[in-house]
Amino acid sequence: DVCDSLVGGRCIHNGCWCERSAPHGNCCNTSGCTATFWCPGTLFD
């Protein structure tokens, strides 16, 4: 559920990517759309 630079900046266990400008905040989903969810506990969790 957290962003981890050790895994390429991906959010662990929720299938989205972290934005570089918000490494612990907003994520992008797999289709490239910006999601307004915080990394921990997203819909993808």
UniProtKB/Swiss-Prot annotation:
Modified residues (4-hydroxyproline): P23, P40
One GO location term (cellular component): extracellular region
Domain of life where this protein originates: Eukaryota
Residue ranges crossing the lipid bilayer per the database entry: none
Keywords attached to this entry: Bromination, Disulfide bond, Hydroxylation, Ion channel impairing toxin, Neurotoxin, Secreted, Toxin
Modification sites for 6'-bromotryptophan: W17, W38
GO-annotated molecular function: ion channel regulator activity; toxin activity
Tissue expression notes: Expressed by the venom duct.
Function: Mu-conotoxins block voltage-gated sodium channels. This toxin reversibly blocks voltage-gated sodium channel in cephalopods, with no alteration in the voltage dependence of sodium conductance or on the kinetics of inactivation.
Domain notes: The cysteine framework is XII (C-C-C-C-CC-C-C).
Protein name: Mu-conotoxin-like Cal 12.1.2e
Species annotation: Californiconus californicus (California cone)
